[in-house]
Each structure stands twice: as structure tokens, then as C-alpha cells.
């Protein structure tokens, strides 16, 4: 094979190599996936289009089904504990109460048999809710209604608040993936699977011929579902994969319409529309955007015109197992002592509990480039009620993470 043909062959293979996703597994290591979408603050309702392959995508959802197949817990739709009396849709008391400060605090207790890495993974999954929405998971004191997160026999949850202590099963060894943990927590917040929406027939076709009679109830459509006035989300963390419950190898059970090539389902983490739905259901006024991309840009609202007073916005950048490099192209924030008024802050992770990469920064001097240690970076922009300025504009790129290995004799 001559050099020209070899280069063509490598160019053909390269996209496939780069497109292989790495999942968030808290038994081992942490990573996410990316797409080529570039998202800005104004695109809060635009969810990313996952770039992972069907087989890898379904590996995550099939993990739930595989783990749950031997579960002694009776489940609907693969991972939902059915209610004994109240309707799963028309249940006004199924939502967690909101405090006067606008925060929805949900008490929880963790299984004492969890090891340190399990606890860390569960809390990281919770922290993304707290960063992107007004949902805060807090350790239980004496509250009557709370979550019991334990390693039972499977990955499953109740729908919404049921009263008293309610179990979310996050089994060690099978369910310790960020997307799965967030999926089950989302059920507890009051969300069903995306394909159960009343308007689903406009967006997907259920291929009943490839679904066994015993599994058909798992594809039930709720005619009176509350869709919150938000679009159908193919990339929701609550969406089935295309081959879920298929009885014929290679045949899809859910096909997008009118474009059958649209990618559906993932278990990697909350999408922008997942976040928007939580905030709308719980009447949260949060400014948050998820950017799943290898490169892109972001800017303060109204840039290059002046930003608004009393702003609190975050951008969560997620890439596929790549370090993120953030470069500020323009920077003009009102100067205050210690930057206690308007500021930009950057974290080395997906929440405000993560290590700080760039502490509160204001003024007109462009900050130096910021590089994450992993595939996650959070940018926070806060302003007070005083004077404003033009704000900032930034771009980001990503590079493969270099892993170090110790050689043992």
C-alpha cells in the first residue's frame, strides 16, 4: 500500500476512532461524551445531539435492564416502582416542596455499605442538579419525607414523592454510572420516560412488531401527560435507546420521525431540555447551559452590549475524555474590591464544589487561559445590582487526556 492510499485509509478510520464514547463509571473512572454542537447562553432549550453509537448508547440503558432482570422488585417501564393508588400522572402531591428562597431541598440518606468512590459518584451526580437547577439534595435530619439511596437489587426508583422514606436503588457494581444515577433521581423528582409523552407519535414511531406482548406496557403513552410546553427531547437522559426491549436482533423498537437517522437516547447525563423541564416544573429561575462539544464559544448575555444586573449564569462544558482549554477573547467587567460585585469564576469539574481553576475575576484585563484536568469545566458569571459593562466572550477547545501508567516489577 503506497503512502497516498495509507493516508486515505487513516482519514477514513479517524472519525470512528474519535467517536467512541467513554462512560461515567464510578466503579472505575470518570468521563463523558461530546457532540459537535456549539451552544451559547441563548440556546438553553437546545439539547445536544449525542455522537455515540447505538451499541454504546444502549450499553448504558441495557445495563439498567440487565441488572433489573433478576430484581425481586416489581417494576414498570423497566425501572419505575408502580404506585399503589394515586395516578402516576395526575398527582399534585407527587412533587417536592419549594422553600421560600426558591430552593427545593430533598433530604436523603445513603446506604452505609457504599464505599468512598460510590458516595463520591452519587454526590457528583446530585451536584449537577444543584448547579443547573434549584434542586438541592441535603442530608436528612428529621424530615418525614426523604430518599433512601441504597444498593438494593437493581437500578430503580419511585415516580415523584410518595411520602415517608422512599427507596432509590443504585446497586453497587451495576448502577454506578452518573447518567443512570441522574435518571433514577429524575424519576423521584416526578419525571417519566420521554417516550411516554402524550405527543410522542409526532416524534417517534413505536415498532410494536418487534416488542413482545409482555414488554408492550413499557411503551405506554400517557394521554394526559404534562409536557410543560417544552419540545420533545431525543437526547433526554430519560429516553429509551432505539433497541430497548427488542425481540429481534438488529430491529429497533423506537424510530424517530420524520427523520429516522436522528440519534435517540443516552445515559450520560442531563440534557439542556432535562434541565429546562426541571426548572419549569419546580418554577426555578436558573440560567444554566450544558455544552457538549469538542470546541465552541460562549459569551455573557447581550454581549457586546452591557450585561444585565443581578445575573447568575453557569455554563457546563462536557467533552469526550479530553481536557478543556478556555480562552477569553474579550473581558470587561465592573471592577470592585475583591471582585465581590461582578465576576467570572471557573471550576475544574461539573459543580461549584469542584476545585477552583480561576477565582473571582473582574476588571478589563483579559485572564490567562484556563485548562481543566478532566473533561468537565464549569464557568460561573455573577453580577450585582450596580453598574454593568460589556461582559466577556470566550472560546474553548479540547485535547486528549494523557494518562499515566505505573509499571510494576
Swiss-Prot record:
Tissue-specificity statement: Expressed in ovary and gonads.
Q: Cite the entry's keywords alphabetically.
A: Cell membrane, Cytoplasm, Cytoplasmic vesicle, Disulfide bond, Fertilization, Hydrolase, Membrane, Metal-binding, Metalloprotease, Protease, Signal, Zinc, Zymogen
Q: Does the keyword Membrane apply?
A: yes
The parts of the chain that form a coiled coil are none
| UniProt cross-references to Gene3D superfamilies, sorted A to Z | Collagenase (Catalytic Domain), Spermadhesin, CUB domain
Secretion signal: which residues? 1-19
The coenzyme or cofactor needed here is: Zn(2+)
The entry's active site is 184
- Domain of life where this protein originates: Eukaryota
Single GO MF descriptor: peptidase activity
Entry's Gene Ontology cellular component terms? cortical granule; cytoplasm; plasma membrane
Q: Where is this region: Disordered?
A: 30-54
**Residues of the Peptidase M12A domain:** 87-285
Q: Where is the CUB domain?
A: 287-399
Q: One Pfam family, please name it.
A: Astacin
Entries under SMART domains matching the protein = CUB (SM00042), ZnMc (SM00235)
User: GO:BP terms for this protein?
Assistant: cell adhesion; fertilization; negative regulation of binding of sperm to zona pellucida; positive regulation of protein processing; prevention of polyspermy; proteolysis
Q: How is the cofactor bound?
A: Binds 1 zinc ion per subunit.
State the CDD domains in the record: CUB, ZnMc_hatching_enzyme
Reported function = Probable oocyte-specific oolemmal receptor involved in sperm and egg adhesion and fertilization. May act as a protease.
- What is the official name of this protein in its record? Astacin-like metalloendopeptidase
Q: Which organism is it from?
A: Gallus gallus
Amino acid at each position: 500500500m503506497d503512502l497516498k492510499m495509507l493516508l486515505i485509509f487513516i482519514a477514513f478510520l479517524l472519525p470512528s476512532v474519535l467517536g467512541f464514547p467513554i462512560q461515567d463509571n464510578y466503579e472505575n473512572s470518570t468521563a463523558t461524551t461530546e457532540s459537535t454542537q456549539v451552544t451559547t447562553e441563548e440556546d438553553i432549550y437546545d439539547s445536544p445531539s449525542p455522537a455515540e453509537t447505538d451499541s454504546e448508547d444502549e450499553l448504558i440503558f441495557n445495563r439498567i435492564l440487565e441488572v433489573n432482570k433478576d430484581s425481586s422488585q416489581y417494576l414498570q417501564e423497566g425501572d419505575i416502582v408502580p404506585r399503589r393508588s394515586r395516578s402516576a400522572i395526575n398527582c399534585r402531591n407527587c412533587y417536592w416542596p419549594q422553600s421560600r428562597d426558591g430552593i427545593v431541598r430533598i433530604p436523603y440518606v445513603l446506604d452505609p455499605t457504599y464505599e468512598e468512590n460510590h458516595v463520591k459518584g452519587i454526590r457528583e451526580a446530585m451536584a449537577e442538579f444543584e448547579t443547573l437547577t434549584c434542586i438541592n439534595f441535603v442530608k436528612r435530619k428529621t424530615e418525614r419525607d426523604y430518599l433512601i439511596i441504597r444498593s438494593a437489587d437493581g437500578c430503580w426508583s419511585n415516580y415523584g414523592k410518595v411520602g415517608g422514606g422512599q427507596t432509590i436503588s443504585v446497586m453497587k457494581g451495576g448502577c454506578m454510572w452518573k447518567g443512570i444515577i441522574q435518571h433514577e433521581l429524575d424519576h423521584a423528582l416526578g419525571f417519566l420516560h420521554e417516550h411516554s409523552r402524550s405527543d410522542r407519535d409526532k416524534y417517534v414511531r413505536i415498532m410494536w412488531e418487534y416488542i413482545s406482548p409482555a414488554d408492550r406496557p413499557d411503551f405506554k403513552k400517557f394521554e394526559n401527560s404534562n409536557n410543560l410546553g417544552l419540545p420533545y427531547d431525543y437526547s433526554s437522559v430519560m429516553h429509551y435507546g432505539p433497541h430497548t426491549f427488542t425481540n429481534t436482533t438488529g430491529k429497533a423498537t423506537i424510530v424517530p420521525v420524520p427523520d429516522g437517522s436522528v440519534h435517540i437516547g443516552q445515559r450520560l447525563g442531563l440534557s439542556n431540555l432535562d434541565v429546562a423541564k426541571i426548572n419549569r416544573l419546580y418554577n426555578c429561575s436558573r440560567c444554566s447551559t450544558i455544552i457538549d462539544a469538542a470546541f465552541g464559544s460562549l459569551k455573557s448575555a447581550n454581549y457586546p452590549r452591557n450585561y444585565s444586573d443581578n445575573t447568575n449564569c453557569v455554563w457546563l462544558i462536557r467533552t469526550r475524555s479530553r481536557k478543556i482549554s478556555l480562552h477569553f477573547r474579550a473581558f470587561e467587567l465592573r471592577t470592585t474590591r475583591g471582585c465581590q460585585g461582578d465576576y467570572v469564576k471557573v471550576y475544574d469539574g461539573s459543580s461549584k464544589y469542584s476545585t477552583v481553576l480561576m477565582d473571582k475575576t473582574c476588571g478589563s484585563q483579559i485572564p490567562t487561559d484556563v485548562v481543566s484536568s478532566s473533561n468537565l469545566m464549569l464557568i460561573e458569571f455573577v453580577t450585582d445590582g450596580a453598574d454593568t459593562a460589556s461582559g466577556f466572550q470566550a472560546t474553548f477547545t479540547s485535547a486528549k487526556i494523557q494518562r499515566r501508567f505505573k509499571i510494576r516489577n
